[in-house]
């Protein structure tokens, strides 16, 4: 190694040593600063006036739970002051030794532990001081609370004393609970003044809860007592009185246990007084509700019978008249049937229907007479009579509907006869009119379809007139033949219009085709065929189709133009 290299090496080593020394001095100074701060914090905590606060609470001569709590916190302070601070002192001394001997890592670790110890001690001291402060303040705090509780209690006592009659059977238990609360106040005063404010506070909490609970009870009891002792018995007495009057007035009831239900209600009132006496107010309220529902149910029974009596009275006054009216209607129906039987063949069901109705009316009359005769000494509940009479009224209404139906059918017979005669005359005139209408068309011939329809309609019209000329007219047969004749006339009229329309249009199109025949062989051929069908076969529809199809090729739309023009000027058949 050369001299130059040796010099550089020595300089480097010197620099490293200087840097190491500087770092060591820095770490040492930093640890010393942290240790000084911890020492000051330890002294600050140690010098807190905890001993004075402990002595102040000790001089209160606490007992019971308060004394137990004080001893626990005092022992914790003793442990801290004798052991924890000594441990911190030893750890500080050990950390200083590490720091002076340049064992900085151990010193730093030791300082961290000391900081944790001091933080825990600080928290413990704060908890001890707060607990001591609470013990010291508890007595005065209790004194303020008890004044408010006493005000509530005195107000409650005053309410009960002034309105004692409102509490009924509950008064003894309420007064007993007031005495218990008074005893709790005495127990509180003893504990609070003898050095156990913590236990006294527990007693005061219970006392306040008891006052609030009893206040709620005192609020609820009067209404329950009024309902149970006055309102419900009054309602029941009114019901009993009303029941006696109804019995005296010969009312009967479907329910046979009304007297027993009265007795059960009185027993329920007595039992519920025990709930009031024991301050079982929820049970008392429920039982009051059940009793009210039962009273309402009985009231509904009585009002039902009273209302039913009025309905029965009205029905007994109106049903005989209603029945007599229906009997008269039935007599008229019988007379109508007898009269119509001289002219018409009536179905046997009409007469048998009227006879059956007459039998039913006689049965209903017997039932009404029986009910009416028993009204002076009724043996059934009016609600039962109401149901029976309303059922009877419904049956009478059904029979009346039957009478109306029979009457309408009988009336319809004569209407159908008149209508058929009028239609027969109309159809005869229409046949003549249609015949003249066709003759005026000067057609080369009449199609067989028309002739068949014409003769069929003529024959059926003649059959209708024959039916109407019978000595005993069968109106069902008349109606059937009339329907056939009507359909025939409608078909004949439609066919007449169709024949005349196609014949007229065919003639017009044949004339119009003259402008094309001289140079259009296809139209000339169609003309010849259509004319042949028109004059020989008399199938005017087929003839129209033949010529119109040919013209449509030469002049599209020409057929519709002729059809539209015809429909605007078509001559109708004037019947």
UniProtKB/Swiss-Prot annotation:
Q: Which UniProt keywords apply?
A: Cell cycle, Cell division, Cell membrane, Coiled coil, Membrane, Septation, Transmembrane, Transmembrane helix
Q: Where in the cell is it found?
A: Cell membrane
Tell me the superkingdom of the source. Bacteria
Q: One Pfam family of this protein, by short name?
A: EzrA
Picking any one GO biological process from the record gives: division septum assembly
Q: Is Transcription one of the keywords?
A: no
Coiled-coil stretches are 105-191, 265-301, 354-416, 456-526
Membrane-spanning segments:
9-27
Topology relative to the membrane, per the entry?
Single-pass membrane protein
Q: What does this protein do?
A: Negative regulator of FtsZ ring formation; modulates the frequency and position of FtsZ ring formation. Inhibits FtsZ ring formation at polar sites. Interacts either with FtsZ or with one of its binding partners to promote depolymerization.
Query: Which family does this protein fall into?
Result: Belongs to the EzrA family.
Q: What is this protein called?
A: Septation ring formation regulator EzrA
């Amino acid at each position: 190694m050369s001299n130059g290299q040796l010099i550089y090496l020595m300089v480097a080593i010197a620099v490293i040593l200087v840097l190491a020394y500087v770092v060591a001095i820095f770490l040492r100074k930093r640890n010393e600063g942290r240790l000084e701060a911890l020492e000051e914090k330890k002294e600050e905590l140690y010098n807190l006036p905890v001993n004075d606060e402990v002595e102040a609470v000790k001089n209160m001569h606490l007992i019971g739970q308060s004394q137990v709590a004080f001893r626990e916190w005092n022992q914790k302070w003793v442990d801290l002051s004798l052991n924890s601070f000594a441990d911190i002192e030893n750890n500080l001394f050990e950390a200083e030794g590490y720091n002076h001997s340049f064992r900085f890592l151990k010193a730093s670790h030791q300082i961290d532990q000391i900081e944790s110890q001091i933080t825990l001690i600080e928290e413990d001291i704060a908890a001890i001081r707060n607990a001591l402060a609470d013990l010291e303040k508890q007595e005065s705090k209790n004194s303020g609370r008890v004044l408010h509780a006493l005000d509530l209690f005195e107000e409650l006592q005053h309410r009960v004393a002034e309105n004692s009659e409102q509490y009924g059977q509950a008064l003894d238990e309420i007064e007993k609970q007031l005495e218990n609360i008074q005893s709790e106040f005495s127990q509180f005063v003893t504990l609070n003044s003898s050095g156990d404010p913590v236990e006294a506070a527990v007693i005061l909490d219970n006392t306040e809860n008891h006052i609030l609970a009893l206040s709620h009870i005192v609020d609820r009891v009067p209404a329950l007592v009024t309902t149970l002792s006055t309102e419900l018995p009054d309602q029941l007495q009114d019901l009993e009185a009303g029941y006696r009057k109804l019995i005296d007035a010969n009312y009967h009831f479907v329910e046979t246990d009304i007297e027993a239900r009265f007795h059960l209600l009185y027993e329920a009132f007595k039992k519920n007084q025990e709930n009031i006496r024991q301050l079982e107010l929820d049970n008392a309220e429920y039982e009051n509700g059940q009793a009210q529902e039962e009273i309402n149910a009985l009231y509904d029974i009585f009002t039902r019978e009273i209302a039913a009596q009025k309905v029965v009275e009205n029905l007994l006054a109106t049903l005989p008249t209603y029945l007599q009216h229906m009997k008269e209607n039935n007599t008229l129906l019988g007379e109508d049937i007898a009269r119509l039987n001289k002219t018409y063949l009536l179905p046997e069901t009409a007469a048998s229907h009227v006879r059956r109705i007459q039998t039913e009316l006689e049965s209903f009359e017997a039932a009404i007479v029986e009910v009416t005769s028993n009204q002076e000494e009724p043996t059934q509940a009016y609600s039962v009579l109401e149901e029976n009479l309303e059922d009877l009224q419904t049956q009478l209404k059904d029979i009346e509907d039957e009478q109306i139906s029979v009457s309408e059918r009988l009336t319809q017979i004569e209407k159908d006869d008149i209508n058929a005669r009028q239609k027969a005359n109309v159809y005869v005139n229409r046949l003549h009119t249609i015949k003249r209408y066709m003759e005026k068309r000067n057609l080369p011939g009449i199609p067989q379809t028309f002739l068949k329809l014409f003769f069929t309609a003529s024959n059926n019209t003649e059959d209708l007139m024959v039916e109407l000329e019978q000595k005993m007219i069968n109106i069902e047969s008349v109606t059937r033949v009339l329907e056939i004749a009507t359909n025939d006339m409608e078909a004949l009229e439609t066919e007449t219009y169709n024949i005349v329309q196609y014949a007229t249009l065919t003639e017009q199109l044949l004339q119009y085709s003259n402008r094309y025949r001289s140079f259009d062989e296809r139209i000339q051929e169609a003309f010849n065929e259509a004319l042949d069908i028109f004059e020989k076969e008399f199938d005017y529809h087929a003839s129209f189709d033949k010529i119109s199809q040919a013209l449509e090729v030469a002049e599209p739309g020409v057929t519709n133009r002729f059809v539209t023009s015809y429909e605007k000027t078509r001559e109708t058949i004037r019947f």
